[in-house]
Design a protein with these regions (language model features):
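A catalytic-pocket lid/entrance helix-loop region that shapes and gates access to the active site
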Residues: 71-105
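Helix-loop "lid/cap" segments that line or gate small-molecule binding pockets
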Residues: 103-115, 122-128, 141-148
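Conserved serine/cysteine hydrolase catalytic core
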Residues: 114, 132-177
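Generic structural signal for small/hydrophobic residues in well-ordered secondary structure
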Residues: 2, 6-9, 31, 46-50, ...
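Active-site loop/oxyanion-hole signature of alpha/beta-hydrolase fold enzymes
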Residues: 3-48
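Alpha-helical elements of Rossmann-like donor-binding domains used by nucleotide-donor carbohydrate transfer enzymes
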Residues: 26-34, 58, 105, 122, ...
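Short, solvent-exposed loop/turn segments at secondary-structure junctions
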Residues: 9-10, 21, 52-53, 76-78, ...
Length: 177
C-alpha cells in the first residue's frame, strides 16, 4: 500500500483560500492527522520529496518508532542557521510578489524537461483561479531561512532526533529532474 498525499493547498480537494491559513505548524498537524489518526498507520516506509521533506522529516523525528525506512529526494530540513542558496532566497521573495501566480509555468521553469500541455494542465487544475493558489503561493515563505524563523527551534530539535535515527535512510538529489 502506498499513500501519496497532496499537501493542503495543492491537490483538488477543498482548501483554505487565505495565505494566513497556511503555516508550517498547520501543514504538519494536517499531515500527522492524516497519517496517524485517519489512516492509523503504525509502521511504514516513508518517501518524501521537495516540500514534503519539510514535513515528513519532522514526522520521522517525532515518531521514529513508526518509520521503517526513509527515502528523501531533493529536500531537507532547514533551521535557518545555514545560508540558503541565493537562487532559493530570490525565488522565496519573488513568489510572494507574483500576481498572477502561474503554477504550471513555475513548474516548467523548474524542470529540465519540456512538459506537455496535458501535464501542465494537470498542475494547473487544482488552481482554477488565484483564490485557490494561497497554499502554493505561501509555501516558499514557510521554509526557515533565518535563525528568527518560528520553526527554527522545532527543526533543530528534529535534527537532534534524526541524528539518532538508525534505520535505513536514502537521500536522493539530482541535477536533471
Amino acid at each position: 500500500r502506498v499513500i501519496a498525499p497532496d499537501l493542503m493547498g495543492f491537490g483538488r480537494s477543498d482548501k483554505p483560500t487565505e495565505q494566513s491559513d497556511y503555516t508550517y505548524a498547520k501543514h504538519l498537524a494536517w499531515l500527522k492527522e492524516l497519517v496517524f489518526e485517519r489512516l492509523k498507520l503504525e509502521k511504514f516506509h516513508l518517501f518524501v520529496q521537495d516540500w514534503g521533506g519539510l514535513l515528513g522529516l519532522r514526522i520521522v523525528a517525532e515518531h521514529p518508532d513508526s518509520i521503517l525506512t526513509v527515502t528523501a529526494g531533493n529536500t531537507g530540513l532547514p533551521t535557518g542557521d545555514q545560508q540558503m542558496p541565493d537562487a532559493f532566497l530570490a525565488w522565496q521573495k519573488m513568489s510572494q510578489k507574483m500576481n498572477p501566480f502561474p503554477v504550471g509555468s513555475i513548474i516548467q521553469r523548474a524542470t529540465v524537461s519540456h512538459l506537455s500541455p496535458e501535464i501542465l494542465a494537470a498542475y494547473n487544475a487544482p488552481h482554477p483561479d488565484e483564490t485557490y493558489k494561497a497554499g502554493a503561493k505561501i509555501f516558499p515563505a514557510l521554509v526557515p531561512t533565518t535563525p528568527e524563523d518560528p520553526e527554527n527551534a522545532n527543526n533543530k530539535a528534529a535534527w537532534a532526533s534524526l541524528m539518532k535515527f538508525e534505520k535505513p535512510f536514502l537521500t536522493l538529489f539530482s541535477d536533471s529532474d
